[in-house]
Amino acid sequence: MNSKIFAVLFLLAFLSCVLSDQYCPKSSITACKKMNIRNDCCKDDDCTGGSWCCATPCGNFCKYPTDRPGGKRAAGGKSCKTSYVY
């Protein structure tokens, strides 16, 4: 009986981890000088290891997703270039 309860609880915990929403992390930076803005990525395919291309005030950077909302995924597009923006 106890093993069945444990199995059910384990399965519920596992599913909540797998099915939870993922977001770009919220940036701790609120502003950036124009000469410091750069894009390390323009889309998720530019990132490696399961990280996402996330927008920050200082440009786009590869970040690992988190379960806390607040960040913003990079829009990409044809005008996006990976380099300094100025």
From Swiss-Prot:
Residues 21-66 form the WAP domain. Expressed by the venom gland. The keyword Transferase does not apply. Disulfide bonds join C24-C54, C32-C58, C41-C53, C42-C80, C47-C62. Keywords: Antibiotic, Antimicrobial, Disulfide bond, Secreted, Signal, Toxin. GO terms for molecular function: toxin activity. It is found in: Secreted. SUPFAM superfamilies: Elafin-like. Contains 5 disulfide bonds. Belongs to the venom protein 11 family. 01 (wap-1) subfamily. This is U15-lycotoxin-Ls1a. The lineage of its organism: Eukaryota, Metazoa, Ecdysozoa, Arthropoda, Chelicerata.
